[in-house]
From Swiss-Prot:
Homodimer. It comes from Saccharopolyspora erythraea (strain ATCC 11635 / DSM 40517 / JCM 4748 / NBRC 13426 / NCIMB 8594 / NRRL 2338). This is Uroporphyrinogen decarboxylase. Belongs to the uroporphyrinogen decarboxylase family. The record marks D85 as: Transition state stabilizer.
Length: 363
């Protein structure tokens, strides 16, 4: 697969703590950013998003630039992550879906048969060119702060398409996987193409790192993950590595509840493995070493429980210090939450977390 977008020369940010940590080097301090840092916890976000639908917001370059930069200005985080949504490339390709407040992505016509899969539209680079435009604006806006691009992994996108929306048990998804494996793999091949096109658009525009979100992979057993999911996620990471101008761009892989899948997720081609709050980082690092003894020292990202941010500063400070200590067992550590920032989080607490991480880890 190729991408026709012209390639923007990548910024020289070799000393940026996020990129140094992702390479397993020793940065001047432990880098910190937060999943969903650009979102409803910020009053400035709520103001600029007022009255504008989510998917429209994601395709408005000036707005994407402003929202992406807001947490960098407010918190002093070590990376920005592109404001977008994991279902955006499906929407851009022509899949009928909407993001319903209080529910999440809702698909008009679920994909449940081989014919449905065959009819699923492909994504062309020009359909997400506005995302590339937003990245271009951000490179000027962010200065020396790295920009992380991202996309949803095929399994998580498939779950939304097959279930028709968010699901607790993913029963239709797993049923299709086991009853019609050929149809399942055809679906994930198409979704891997879509995801790779979306990521290559961001890479061509100049993002400094990428994260593949497999939000719902934790619903799977290790056996099922290896058979039905891993080959398609691996193809994405291989495609990213082969993208012109993207050599050396760090690749992060994250899912919720994936403590038993960490080694397999790394083996897909990730340089950094995101860990949720359920597994201590030193335990995660040990699991990664055991699963891939020939892959070098693992780099981990995480993993403060987002709910702890509501517990008062004494508890937050204690947990941050514990996580920093556990992270030292890995070959590198990027501080983050174990999932996204919750909408009612006090942004002042996030700023204090950034300050604490920087102060405690200064080298």
């Amino acid at each position: 697969m190729t991408n026709s977008a012209p390639v923007t020369p990548r910024r020289d940010l070799a000393d940026a703590p996020l990129l140094a940590a992702a390479r397993g080097e020793t940065p001047r301090h432990t880098p910190v950013w937060f999943m969903r840092q650009a979102g409803r916890s910020l009053p400035e976000y709520r103001k600029v998003r007022e009255g504008i639908p989510m998917l429209q917001s994601c395709l408005t370059p000036d707005l994407v630039c402003e929202i992406t930069a807001q947490p960098v200005r407010r918190h002093g985080v070590d990376a920005a992550i592109l404001f977008s949504d994991i279902v955006l490339p499906l929407h851009a390709a022509g899949v009928g879906l909407d993001i319903v407040a209080g529910t999440g992505p809702v698909v008009a016509e679920p994909v449940r048969t081989a014919a449905d899969v065959a009819a699923l539209p492909s994504l062309a680079p020009e359909q997400v060119s506005k995302v590339g435009d937003a990245v271009g604006l951000l490179l000027d806006e962010l200065g020396s702060t790295p920009l992380i691009g991202f996309a949803g992994a095929p399994f998580t996108l498939a779950s939304y398409l097959v279930e028709g929306g968010p699901s607790r048990n993913h029963e239709r998804t797993k049923a299709l996987m086991h009853s019609e494996p050929a149809t399942w793999h055809a679906l994930l091949e198409k979704l891997a193409d879509t995801t790779l096109t979306f990521l290559r658009t961001q890479l061509a525009a100049g993002v400094d790192a990428i994260q593949l979100f497999d939000s719902w992979a934790g619903a799977l057993s290790l056996r099922d993950y290896r058979e039905f999911v891993l080959p398609h996620s691996r193809r994405i990471f291989e495609g990213v590595a082969e993208t012109p101008g993207a050599a050396g761009v760090p690749k992060i892989h994250f899912g919720v509840g994936t403590g038993e899948l960490l080694g397999a997720m790394r083996s897909a081609g990730a340089d950094v493995v995101g860990v949720d709050w359920r597994v201590p980082l030193d335990t995660a690092a040990q699991r990664l070493r055991e699963a891939g003894p020939d892959q070098g020292a693992p780099v981990v990202q995480g993993n403060l429980d987002p709910a702890v941010l509501f517990a008062g500063w004494e508890a937050v400070e204690r947990e941050v210090r514990r996580i920093l200590a556990e992270g030292r067992a890995a070959g590198g550590h990027i501080f983050n939450l174990g999932h996204g920032v919750l909408p009612s989080t006090d942004p002042g607490v996030l700023t204090r977390v950034v300050e604490l991480v920087h102060a405690e880890s200064a080298r």
